[in-house]
């Protein structure tokens, strides 16, 4: 869908055309779900928040100004809902589900020469996922938008309502925290 087509759909949706909005919602449903899943760490919560995001966007579409992309606006709604949800449920520990929707779902399966390498690779994946989940919320949100949603620092800054410098700093700190958290594993991997 080209940007002009998307703008036309937004304008039609603003005029009350439900079908136009449904086309937009269908296009962005999965990226929004993946982001919300990374933030909430729970499929059911992510699915509920995705629905809530689409409903809120539908109700507010007339207020949307075409100053930013529909994608940026929709992700901003999703992030705000997720942050409110997380704050509300901060004291409740939901069971952790391991992430299986990585950025590149069609990644090639690596070829390992030994069972030890398979075990180490699986251990690394689990440790990486856990390390990402343990990042402070602001860093995890920024990291998820850029790494898993493929957004630029500028787009992430618009969604998060902060400066590009803040986004860059959060990415720097998130990478530093991940590297520190994974340091024992990285040393082990180099020894094999």
Tell what function each PLM region has.
Residues 72, 83, 139, 145-148, ...:
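DNA-recognition helix of helix-turn-helix
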Residues 14-15, 41, 54-69, 88-90:
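Sigma70-family region 2
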Residues 11, 15, 90, 111-144, ...:
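Amphipathic alpha-helical segment used for protein-protein interaction
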Residues 62-65, 76-97, 173, 184:
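Arg/Lys-rich amphipathic alpha helix in sigma70-family domain 2
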Residues 1-3, 12, 94-100, 127, ...:
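C-terminal edge and immediately downstream basic/flexible tail or linker adjoining helix-turn-helix-like DNA-binding
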Residues 14-23, 33-52, 164, 186-191:
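Short, charged helix-capping/linker segments at alpha-helix termini
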Residues 3, 92-118:
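Internal acidic/polar
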Residues 1-31, 116-117, 180, 184, ...:
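N-terminal module of bacterial RNA polymerase sigma factors
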């Amino acid at each position: 869908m080209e940007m002009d087509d998307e703008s036309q759909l937004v304008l039609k949706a603003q005029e009350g055309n439900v079908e136009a909005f449904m086309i937009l919602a269908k296009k962005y449903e999965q990226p929004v779900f993946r982001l919300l899943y990374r933030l909430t760490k729970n499929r059911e919560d992510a699915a509920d928040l995705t629905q809530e995001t689409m409903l809120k966007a539908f109700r507010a579409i007339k207020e949307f100004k075409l100053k930013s992309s529909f994608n940026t606006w929709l992700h901003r709604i999703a992030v705000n809902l997720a942050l409110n949800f997380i704050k509300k449920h901060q004291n409740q520990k939901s069971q952790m589900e391991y992430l299986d929707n990585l950025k590149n779902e069609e990644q090639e399966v690596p070829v390992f020469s030994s069972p030890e390498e398979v075990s180490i690779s699986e251990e690394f994946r689990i440790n990486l996922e856990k390390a990402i989940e343990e990042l402070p919320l602001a860093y995890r949100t920024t990291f998820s938008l850029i790494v898993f949603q493929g957004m630029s620092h500028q787009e992430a800054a618009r969604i998060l309502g902060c400066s590009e410098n803040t986004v860059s700093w959060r990415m720097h700190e998130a990478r530093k925290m991940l590297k520190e958290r994974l340091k024992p594993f990285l040393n082990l991997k180099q020894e094999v």
